[in-house]
A protein has these predicted regions:
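Metal-dependent phosphoester/phosphodiester hydrolase catalytic core
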Residues: 1-458
Length: 458
């Protein structure tokens, strides 16, 4: 470690795919920057830069947080990460889908980006074992722009579904994960084993301080990911897990009419849980009691409603678990919360939304939601245009008046600037077709949220 010049020894081997994890708990001072590097048999890594959280009782003048999500390797290049590496940031929040569990699957993508397709060790298009997940992480982390961004800033990671399998959930009847689009669906023991292997690969390749038991044989005992981080007294961030404990999708596990574009009444069932009972209590109570100037909630999936009349566009988000969302909002409204900042991803879109008890105009605001755009993964505009079925951003904004804006046709990243007075959201489009550190980039949107004033331009 620099600048003190301390040396920390750690080992590695095939049991962790030759990856290294060095936990420096209690060895660093709060609120300061550090440089670090790795040395092995005379070979020295590039120098990395990080910083520790501000200590309790301090009020930083400002925080700048990078927001990214959904970085499918085969759907574009990582020029946005080269730009992110050069930003002045206190941390990067990765809102899930660090990898996608497939490669070269002709059902999903045509080869557009040279050098981005590869076959998994199993020969399958979808990951079916630990070796496949490890190969995916090695491929993604081979990208030089991702390496630069990881070395430039400290990161906070949460996962979504593609670190394991698309639209995954927990099935309480089989005590195993569900994965509606995976060939192991209907085979609970195989899915349970695969989940354990996906979790293991995640801990090997993703630098996150989580509770992990490598010998556990049940996913919920193996890892607990939800946690809280305090940036002094300015922002307390509640990092949630919206995949490991959630109920099956309320309208069924099919596509159109069930997981997408659904109308079933089960969406409002009190039995539908996104968080599970224990995580729900942890979030509801601790966020309500937080003394921080701003209370941050990271949700891998969209928190606010996205509907067209009676049609729910995506039951994989909180709309499929609406009763639990309503219970949280009611509790926070009774507690007088007005400084909530929700950070979300998953939808391959960017948006800003009013957060209020029923999301109706004129209500007192609890806070605002800001969604990070996908880094490379195709957005709904790109996907639905192939089906000649893209209604447009304006249609979705009109159908959902709580939205300040919706952009389903953007790739890039966002920056959140937090001060005691306001939260500012800067949205950047970056051309994913250019494999260069200076890939074209432009500011697409700039908003701020202030309690009592709502969302404003600027």
């Amino acid at each position: 470690l620099e600048p003190q010049g301390g040396l920390i020894e750690t080992g590695f081997g095939p049991e962790t795919d030759y990856t290294v994890r060095a936990d420096l708990d209690g060895q660093l001072e709060p609120g300061r920057g550090y440089f670090y590097r790795f040395i092995y048999r005379g070979v020295t890594s590039p120098i990395g830069r990080t910083r520790t959280l501000h200590p309790p009782g301090t009020m930083p003048e400002r925080l700048r947080l990078g927001l990214i999500t959904c970085q499918e390797f085969g759907s574009g290049y990582y020029g946005a990460l080269a730009h992110l590496a050069r930003e002045e940031l206190d941390a990067v929040i990765h809102l899930g889908d660090f990898i996608y569990e497939y490669s070269g699957d002709p059902r999903y993508r045509r080869e557009r980006f040279l050098g981005r397709a590869f076959r998994l060790p199993s020969g399958s298009y979808l990951a079916v074992n630990l070796a496949d997940y490890r190969a995916l992480y090695r491929a993604y982390r081979s990208d030089p722009f991702l390496q630069q961004a990881l070395a430039a800033h400290p990161w906070v990671f949460l996962w979504d579904d593609h670190e394991f399998a698309n639209d995954t959930y927990w099935d309480p009847t089989t005590h195993a994960p569900g994965a509606p689009d995976h060939p192991f669906q209907g085979q609970p023991e195989r899915l349970k084993k695969l989940r354990l292997e996906a979790n293991q690969a995640w801990t090997e390749y993703v630098p996150a301080r989580v509770v992990y038991d490598p010998v556990a044989n049940e996913p919920h005992r193996q890892m607990s990911q939800y946690r809280r981080l305090a940036f002094g007294d300015l922002l307390e961030l509640f990092v949630t897990d919206t995949r490991s404990y959630r109920s099956p999708h309320p309208c069924g596990e099919g596509g159109f009419g069930q997981r997408q574009f659904a109308t079933c009444s089960a969406q409002m069932s009190p039995s539908q849980t996104m968080l599970g009972a224990e995580q729900y209590r942890w979030l509801a109570e601790n966020l309500m009691q937080s003394p921080a100037k701003w209370r941050g909630l990271t949700s891998a999936v969209m928190f606010s409603p996205l509907r067209s009349g009676d049609l729910t566009l995506n039951t994989d988000g909180w709309d499929g678990y609406a009763a639990e969302r309503q219970a949280l909002l009611n509790a926070w409204a009774r507690a007088g919360v007005h400084n909530l900042v929700v950070l979300s991803g998953d939808l391959h879109s960017a948006l800003a939304s009013q957060v209020s008890p029923t999301f109706k105009p004129g209500e007192p605001w609890l806070g605002a939601e800001f969604m990070a755009p996908s880094l490379t993964s195709p957005g709904p505009a790109e996907t639905l245009r192939r089906l000649a079925f893209w209604p447009g951003n304006a249609f979705l904004e009109q159908a959902n008046p709580h939205l300040n804006f919706f952009d389903g046709d953007i790739n890039g990243y966002a920056v959140l600037e937090v001060t005691p007075e306001a939260v500012r959201y800067e949205l950047y489009w970056v051309d994913k077709t250019q494999n260069r550190p200076d890939a074209p980039k432009r500011l697409a949107r700039k908003l701020r949220y202030r309690p009592g004033r709502g969302l404003e331009a600027g």
